Amino acid sequence: LDLDDAILEELDVVVASVHSGFRQEGEQLTMRLVRAIEHPHVDIIGHPTGRILGERAAYDVDIDRVIEAAVRCGTALEINASPWRLDLQDTLARRAAEAGVMLAVNTDAHDTGELASHMRFGVAVARRAWLGPGQVLNTKPLDDLLAWLARRR
């Protein structure tokens, strides 16, 4: 991770995402994600397949190993609601939820105007994946969300 543990432990929520090295071998990319999942300060893995619709295909990652690690460590996977990402896609979100992974819908908004406009796309992915409120982190009541965030700290 790019930040020291001393900084990460001060944050309310830590989302780790791959933002470089997309052309690495699948094993390397998979291990980067698994190591991030295993990190005690990481709560959510952002855009787990790295795809950008119409621009970049998902990177070569073993999503089943990523899901297994997320289950084992209690790390959530993101449904990135940006209309240019929609990552995780519905079928992978369903697979993750069936395995016991918590999902988090994130707008990936880069300005306040995108908050509401993007969220509907993420909700649509979650619905297509047949996710219930118990499987989506940011539908939880505040006390439950705070308990979930405190579980590994």
Regions found by a protein language model. Give the residues of each.
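Charged catalytic cores and adjacent phosphate/nucleic-acid-binding surfaces used
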Residues: 1-153
